């Protein structure tokens, strides 16, 4: 999945070992899995060349997507186009 982080979310992620995000719509910090129990445990992370993006490798305690899919990236472009026809 792709999510947003602010400094607080990054700090909480690094200090707890669980993936936290900043919700742009709710304007608040959230712990991934807080409601579903599908927590994301940090295994390692990398920072990009500009130090403005991070990539986390996680162990997932369940599906990541709110649809119940293991990943949010489960649809192909063709499926998306055909579903709108």
Swiss-Prot record:
Domain of life from the UniProt record: Archaea
EC number in record: 3.5.4.19
Statement: the UniProt record of this protein carries the keyword Magnesium: yes
Pfam families attached to this UniProt entry: PRA-CH
Pathway the protein contributes to: Amino-acid biosynthesis; L-histidine biosynthesis; L-histidine from 5-phospho-alpha-D-ribose 1-diphosphate: step 3/9
Chief place of localization: cytoplasm
Gene Ontology terms describing biological process: L-histidine biosynthetic process
Chain residues that bind Zn(2+): 49, 65, 72
Cofactor(s) the protein requires to work: Mg(2+); Zn(2+)
Entry keyword Cell inner membrane: no
GO CC terms in record: cytoplasm
GO MF entries: metal ion binding; phosphoribosyl-AMP cyclohydrolase activity
Major enzyme class: hydrolase
Assembly and oligomerization: Homodimer.
PANTHER family: HISTIDINE BIOSYNTHESIS BIFUNCTIONAL PROTEIN (PTHR42945), HISTIDINE BIOSYNTHESIS BIFUNCTIONAL PROTEIN HIS7 (PTHR42945:SF1)
Protein purpose: Catalyzes the hydrolysis of the adenine ring of phosphoribosyl-AMP.
Similarity remark: Belongs to the PRA-CH family.
The protein's name in its UniProt record: Phosphoribosyl-AMP cyclohydrolase
Recorded name of the encoding gene: hisI
């Amino acid at each position: 999945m792709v999510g947003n982080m602010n400094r607080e979310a990054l700090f909480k992620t690094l200090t707890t070992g669980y993936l936290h995000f900043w919700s742009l719509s709710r304007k608040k910090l959230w712990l991934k899995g807080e409601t579903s129990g599908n927590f994301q445990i940090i295994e390692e992370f990398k920072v990009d060349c500009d130090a403005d993006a991070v990539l986390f490798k996680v162990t997932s305690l369940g599906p990541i997507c709110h649809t119940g899919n293991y990943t949010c990236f489960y649809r192909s472009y063709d499926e998306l186009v055909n579903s709108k026809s």
